[in-house]
Amino acid sequence: MINRVSINTVINLANAGGVCGWLLLIRPLIYLIFSRRRELNAYSSVDSSAVVFIFYAVFCFYFSIRVLQKQKSSFARDLLTKSPLIWFVVYTLFGVASIFWSVNTQLTGFRAFECLSMAILMVAILQNVFIQGGCRLAMQWTILYVVVDIVFSIFRALSYTTNIVELLQTSQMMATTFFYIALYQTRKKWWNYLIIAMSIFSMSTVAYIGMALGSISAFFGHAKYRVVVFIATFILGTAIAVIGPYSFVKNTVFFDKKTISIHETTGRDKIMDVAFQALDDRPLGYGFFAGEPYLLYSKNLGAINGHNSLFSAAIGLGIPGIVLISLFFILMWKIAFSRYIPSDYRASLIGCFIVSFLQSMGNPGIGSRVFGGWLPTMFATVLICGFYVYGKYYEEIQDNDNE
């Protein structure tokens, strides 16, 4: 039952992120109003919709820098320099530099700036929430952000369908990325169940694999998590034994494909070939993001994105791009399991990272433009880095938070 008290609570929670928090929360609304479906060959066209998002990126960058300059805490600086985020920043700045050899200078420049703008916006938000309320508030704000995105995604989907199955798939990348946070953290409310339901019915093969692998997070949390995983594993193992491994995989992971094969990966194998060829042809790449639609459209692959962080890096920024993005992910794996992340939150964040990593390896994500899985995977990354920095360098604040 929604009442005035609950509305005020939500508003107060949103306010914890400051102006930057509101800018991120209204993005799904802006997307709902101004986004449009484009032909593949119109990926670089500038219309009223594109102008809105250009202004939005500029506003985000301006207010983020302003907030970071005014804040006395060094949390944001530590987050950007003492965590794997520094390699993402270097990767993105290299993307900006690629305007000098890009096949589309304007497209590369804007998309790289947009990535930098949104990343700094998230850093500013998490600085606000960590300094104000510590780990608990950071988790609560994250849940709010995910739910807001889901709600607006459903509203957008209602413009072209009322099929409940299709509606449950509208925020598959956002919901599944934060599945383990909804499962493990905060008191179970309708919003937790909404995220869990959207994840279960997402019909995303990549997400299902990520969620399955993410179950190892249970071994880093409370004993009750391990019991749940044991029961789920027992049920799953029994089902596989009864149905048979081939039939099980065919009817789940490859449920909409003719056979189990790398060639049934909706064209990702062909995109991989394009990425390898791009490395041969241009070791420095074709320019951040611009190279992806330029090559993939010319190959008639029906995509403008590499659907894999490494493929995107290879096509856009060549060998240096692969090195930088690989270093970023390797260090993210290291800190996701770090002892500096408070034990009460470690399981949630390990599960969250594993799903986000799989999203980046199988969907549009980190390494390319702000699209598809980029926002959830980037927010998950900044969140995990925030917990790491908070636990390692802000022990006094952490002690107060635990009290």
Go through the PLM ranges and name each one.
Residues 1-67, 95-101, 152, 356-361:
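N-terminal signal-anchor transmembrane segment
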Residues 10-17, 79-92, 107, 112-116, ...:
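Interfacial loop-to-transmembrane-helix boundary motif in multi-pass membrane proteins
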Residues 19-22, 346-359, 365-403:
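Transmembrane alpha-helices of multi-pass inner-membrane enzymes
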Residues 59, 96, 117-160, 164-222, ...:
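Alpha-helical transmembrane segments of multi-pass inner-membrane proteins
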Residues 72, 82-85, 317-357, 390-398:
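Hydrophobic transmembrane alpha-helices and their immediate junctions
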Residues 219-260, 273-278:
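A membrane-periplasm/extracellular boundary helix in multi-pass inner-membrane enzymes
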Residues 257-317:
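Long extracytoplasmic/lumenal interhelical loops at the membrane interface
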